Amino acid sequence: MTYNLEFDSRALKEFQKMGEPVKLQFKKKLAEVLEQPHIPANRLRGLPDCYKIKLRASGYRLVYQVIDVQIVVLVLSVGKRERSGVYQTAKQRL
């Protein structure tokens, strides 16, 4: 079953500010996530039904929440990992 992709409006702005190579990498990963969103290795503690996509080379992270009832993957936050900022932002947006 394929999930639908939605962005929090603030996360969409963060995503649009990124460079094209980083966006393309996230798009590839998001396409995989929409097929299989529950990846145990990427699950985040302390954030209900939230997972991460990380781009190790560039240091960027994307945090998404899986809403099974609506069959939706909701992107909460996109940014650098520095000082766990992307995770703190996602927690505030829940």
Locate each region found by the language model.
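Enriched for short, Lys/Arg-rich terminal
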Residues: 2-4, 10-13, 17, 24, ...
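Secondary-structure boundary motif
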Residues: 17-20, 35
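Compact soluble domain cores
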Residues: 22, 26-33
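A short, surface-exposed loop/turn module that caps and links secondary-structure elements
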Residues: 31-55
